[in-house]
Structure formats: structure tokens, C-alpha cells
Amino acid sequence: MEVVSKIDQENQAKIWKQIFGFAESLVLKCAVQLEIAETLHNNVKPMSLSELASKLPAQPVNEDRLYRILHFLVHMKLFNKDATTQKYSLAPPAKYLLKGWEKSMVPSILSVTDKDFTAPWNHLGDGLTGNCNAFEKALGKGIRVYMRENPEKDQLFNEGMACDTRLFASALVNECKSIFSDGINTLAGVGRGTGTAVKAISKAFPDIKCTIHDLPEITSKNSKISRDVFKSVPSADAIFMKSILHEWNDEECIQILKRCKEAIPKGGKVIIADVVIDMDSTHPYSKSRLAMDLAMMLHTGGKERTEEDWKKLIDAAGFASCKITKLSALQSVIEAYPH
């Protein structure tokens, strides 16, 4: 029998890691559902296995099974285990597993790992040989019909998007103040969701009159108008869209951008918040951005785009120029100027 070389061993280990890649997402989901981070946080001091087991909301707890889940979570570096006391505590990333604060990632975790939303991934390769819609193949209908017929899933999705937008909006208003300070008096937020980003912009820049379009809820300061963005877009100095264009193919995006161009005055602009894929595999967000691209392909038939893709798209819609600003967030900001 051939001796396994060190290189072969490393390569086999790499494949085994990928085979069980799904385990990290589902163990993370389990930790959220069991409220492990909440329990440790509320206790303040590190906890032993038996202490933690006795305080979790779900009772009674099988300590052996909890131990094995915790072992995996410690390996993921989400929790710490003291070698001397054998007690568990929160590692720095675990703060994002806590509910009820503005940077909690719990809604995104529960949305992305939902069994229905992960089902289309089992049909990833099917679309290579035709126009297969993976979401429809997995769940029997397209995502937009599915969401209308399953309001609890629509709510779960919107909560996940709002969670992502809160993280993005914090970076946007702190790192991109100049975007909103060059003659913008009115801003129209266009898209699907809860208006989280526009509300953050309105709060950070109170002199800008903000309106929210096609959104289910608003703050008292803002106004809401229902509108089909393929037919028309509200007039404003700036049109703002977050995570909208990535839902659509290039031809559909060009239609939307043309409507936006018609709606803004001279000196106005379109502000797009979306993923910009780069080829730098060392960037902390690189893998997540590539995964988002596959998710859009599976769920809506849309795509994430490279910097060059964005420039071509904006040029095809008749804009004169664009500027891309990278933030400390999953998405970047693309400003499109008509003149």
C-alpha cells in the first residue's frame, strides 16, 4: 500500500474540511437557537458545563451532547474554554450572537441557514445545463411567489436583510459622510425591505428629506410611496438602492438604472449599495461575497458583480461616470453620475 505523503495528507484534510463545511453553519444556528451566548453573557462569569446546561432555556439538557456541541464551537473560536477550570466564556466574535443590540447578527444567521432558503443549494449544478431556477425546483415556485404565500418566511428574510443593513448603515454614515454632503437635499430610497438604511441616513443627516418607496414600514419623519421601479423612479437629488440590483440580471438592472437616471436632476446621482467582488482571496469578506453571488444565482437569477462589471453596467445605462468606495462592510458604495 502506498505511503501517504505529508502533502497528500494535507490535501485530503482540506477536502474533508470542505465536505463538512455545512457543519459550521448549522452548529452556529444551533448555538443561536439554544441561546448559549445569551446564557453565558447573562451569567457574567465563566460557566462550567453543568452550570451552563442548567441555565439554558431548553430543559432538560443532555450534558454529553451539549459538551460535544461546545467542543465544536470552541474549535470555531466562538467560545473559550479555560484549560484549568474547564469553564466556558464568550470569545470576541460571540457578541454578534447576542440578541437585542444593533449589531446582532442573529437574524442573518437564522435567515441564511433556514432549511427552505438552503434547499436550492442542492440544485446548484442543475442550472448549468439549462435555465433551471434552483429555488423553484427546490420549493415548487419562484422566490417572489413563495414569499407572498409564506409571510413568516418573508418576515424572516426581511429581518435578516435589516440585520445586514444595520451593519452596513453604520459603516456608511461613518465612513462616507462626503457622499451625502455635496448638494443633496432630497433622497429617495427604492427597494424591498424595512427602510433600515434610509432611516439611518435620515438620522445621520437630518437636513436631507428622505422618502421610502415600496417599503412596508416607515418612521414618522419619512414618507412612503408605492412604485414599480421598472416603470418609474421617484424624483430626488439622490436615488438610494441597497441590495436591489443584485437580484436582477444585467438587462433588468439597466432598465432600473435608466429609470433612475431619468428621475435625478443635473448634479444628482444614484447611490448603490451592493457587493463588489474582488479577486483578493485574502480579504476577510472575499468568501462571503462569492457565496452571496451563488446565493443570488440560486434564489433570484441575479448576481454579484466585480468592479469592472459595475462600470460596464452603469455605462450601458447611459451614465457618464461612477465612483466605487469600499467600506468595512460586506457591501461597497457605487455612485453613478449622469453628467
From Swiss-Prot:
Keywords for this protein: Alkaloid metabolism, Methyltransferase, S-adenosyl-L-methionine, Transferase
InterPro entries: COMT-like, O_MeTrfase_dom, Plant_O-MeTrfase_dimerisation, SAM-dependent_MTases_sf, WH-like_DNA-bd_sf, WH_DNA-bd_sf
Listed EC numbers: 2.1.1.117
Source species of the chain: Papaver somniferum
Family: Belongs to the class I-like SAM-binding methyltransferase superfamily. Cation-independent O-methyltransferase family. COMT subfamily.
Catalytic activity, as annotated: (S)-scoulerine + S-adenosyl-L-methionine = (S)-tetrahydrocolumbamine + S-adenosyl-L-homocysteine + H(+)
Active site: H246
UniProt binding sites for substrate: D164, S243, I244, L245, H246, E247
Function: Methyltransferase involved in the biosynthesis of the benzylisoquinoline alkaloid noscapine. Catalyzes the conversion of (S)-scoulerine to (S)-tetrahydrocolumbamine.
Pathway: Alkaloid biosynthesis
Protein name: Probable scoulerine-9-O-methyltransferase OMT3B
Gene (name only): OMT3B
Residues reported in the UniProt entry to bind S-adenosyl-L-methionine: M161, T165, G191, D214, D228, V229, K242
Enzyme class: transferase
Molecular function GO labels: (S)-scoulerine 9-O-methyltransferase activity; O-methyltransferase activity; protein dimerization activity
Lineage: Eukaryota, Viridiplantae, Streptophyta, Embryophyta, Tracheophyta
Listed GO biological process terms: alkaloid metabolic process; methylation
Signal peptide: none
